[in-house]
Amino acid sequence: ARSLALAALCGMSFAASAVTVDLRHEFIDGGKSDKSNADRVSVSHRFANGFGFSVEAKWKSGGDNTSQPYSDFVGNGHEESITWQWKANKNFSVTPGFNIESNDSRSIYKPNLRVQYSFDNGFYVAARYRYDYTRYPANAGKDDDKVNRGDAWAGFVLGDWRTELNYVYARSSEGVSRNDNKPYSQEYNVKVAYKLDN
């Protein structure tokens, strides 16, 4: 079975003094006994020279019923990123980046490269390759994991509104199970955003 993630059921992005705040809710359907809800908030900024950064806090539903949204919040780690966006022209950009995600039990290092083409009518397409290297410093007996991940996006901007579809395919090169005892996983994400401040 594939994993279905629906991000931003009630998410929004807005700009305030050139800073973007992104709120997301995520539901992951991993089968009959593996459903989870998670939330995140990130703050990001991109400077005129193309350099950008973001800081993200995460939490999830805990306790006896993780499939219940907003139930017994527990920490779910944090993530920081730096990127540099190079624009070949007004439509095409290339963005290398590096993310670090960590929680109490693991750290994930995520070098990545994204390309995007934006059409003049508001439609855009993008793709990203990311290599996720996971280490478990709190558990010396657990092997590291290495994952090759590909993302594809298609989106549309209309005024202050933006909608986006995202497909993710990730495969462990170490044979670590991701979904249904398979070394790969798939996600389908939907995002709707509204700009509150011009």
Model feature map: region roles:
Residues 41-45, 80-86, 113-117, 129, ...:
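Residues on the lipid-exposed face of transmembrane beta-strands in outer-membrane beta-barrel proteins
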Residues 16-67:
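Short glycine/proline- and aromatic-enriched beta-strand/turn motifs that initiate or cap beta-hairpins
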